[in-house]
Amino acid sequence: MNIRKEIKLNRELKLYIMRHGETEWNMLEKFQGQLNSALTERGIEKIVKTGKELENVKFKAVYTSELGRTIDTAEIILENNNFEKKKDVEKRLKLEKLSELNEIYFGEWQGMDFKEIFLKYPEEAHNYFYDVKNYCAENVKGEELKDGLERFLSGLKKIVNDNEEGNILIVTHGAVLELFFNYIESKEADDFDERNLIGNGEYRIFTYKNGKYVMETFEKKL
C-alpha cells in the first residue's frame, strides 16, 4: 500500500450530526418532509443550549440540508461558538447546503397532521408508524425510506471525501438520522421507527475512520 493511500485510510474525522430545532409543525404534529416550518421559541432556546455545549469545538466545516430549519439551526450554533466569534465576519464559516441531507419526501402527507393522515390513509399510516416493513411510500407519492437512506449516505460520502480531518458540523433531519443510526447498527431501512427519532436540537458524535462511522459513547447532559 502506498503512503498516500495508507494516510487516507487512517484519517479520522469527527462528525457532529444534529437534528434541527423544534419547529411550529413539530409542535402541531404535522409532517414536514421537504416543506419548511419556522423554529419555535422553545426550539431556539434548545439550540442555544446545544450551542453552549459545543462552544469550544473548533469546526472545520458546516453542512446543512437545503431547508430553512436546518440552516437557521446551524447559524445559531455558530453564533454561540467561541472560535467563530473571534473571526472577522468575512472569515467565518459559510454553510454548505446539500440536497442529499434533506428530509425524507413524504409526498401527499407533507403539511398534514398525524390525525388527518390516519383518517385519510388509515392503512398506510398504520404501516408507517407500527408495521413499517409493509409501508409503501409509493401509495402516498413519497420517497421510499431505503432510497432516502441511500441519498443521505451519498451526502455523507461527499462530506468525508472533502474533509481529511477535523470537526464537522452537520445539521439535518429526524427521519434520515433514524435511518442512519439503524444503518450503522447493521439494521435495515424497514427497521425504522418514527417514535424513536432523536430529539430536536440534539446531536450525536461520530468518528469516521478506515471507511466506517462509529458513534462515540454519549452521555445525556442533564
Predicted regions span which residues?
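Phosphate-coordination/substrate-recognition cap region in phosphate-metabolizing enzymes
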Residues: N10, K49-H126
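Domain-level recognition of soluble alpha/beta enzyme cores
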Residues: K187-V214
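Short glycine/proline- and acidic residue-enriched helix-loop micro-motifs
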Residues: A125-D147
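Extreme N-terminal starter segment of soluble prokaryotic enzymes
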Residues: N10-Y16
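Loop-to-helix element that buttresses phosphate recognition and phosphoryl-transfer chemistry
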Residues: E22-D72, V140-F152
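Glycine-rich phosphate-binding loop signature in dinucleotide/nucleotide-binding domains
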Residues: N56-K58, I159-N167
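GST superfamily/GST-like fold recognition
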Residues: G174-E178, E202
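Residue-level preference for the first positions of well-ordered beta-strands
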Residues: L15, E165-V171
